[in-house]
Amino acid sequence: MADNEILQMHDLKPAPGAKKDRTRVGRGEGSKGKTSGRGAKGQTKRNHVRPGFEGGQLPLYMRLPKLRGFKNPFKVEFQVINIARLVELFPEGGEVAVADLIAKGAVRDNAPVKVLGDGETTVAFTLKGVKASASAKSKIEAAGGSVSED
């Protein structure tokens, strides 16, 4: 095509090397004939082996023990927060609800909250809407606070 001619649709063609024919195997000795790239004799020449087959050796999935039991789909996973963390977040004490803990970024709103007894407190907390361990409850009540689960 000369430089001064206008390029037209019928003049377009793929770039050199852009289109490559796929290799047709088993069509003569000149190009991937006979064994067609599968190597010499044997199991993989004739057919394929299924996933997990180890050549007759006892396979891994049969060597390992069966898993026992089941996963309870209704198990309630609590988000835990310790008394020491409560004292950090609310040094003045007072009434603390789950919404306050979410606002401070201590817990998320996708699971219930449980307070554990790690740490000491001298300020009185009034916890609402949370569960508490026995040790946490006794420490909070000793400091003059209270815990309600509703």
UniProtKB/Swiss-Prot annotation:
Keywords: Ribonucleoprotein, Ribosomal protein, RNA-binding, rRNA-binding. Residues 1-55 are annotated as: Disordered. Residues 8-32 have a biased composition (Basic and acidic residues). InterPro entries: Ribosomal_uL15, Ribosomal_uL15/eL18, Ribosomal_uL15/eL18_sf, Ribosomal_uL15_bac-type. SUPFAM superfamilies: Ribosomal proteins L15p and L18e. GO terms for cellular component: cytosolic large ribosomal subunit. GO terms for molecular function: rRNA binding; structural constituent of ribosome. Part of the 50S ribosomal subunit. NCBIfam families: rplO_bact. Binds to the 23S rRNA. Belongs to the universal ribosomal protein uL15 family. This is Large ribosomal subunit protein uL15. It comes from Bifidobacterium longum (strain NCC 2705). The lineage of its organism: Bacteria, Bacillati, Actinomycetota, Actinomycetes, Bifidobacteriales.
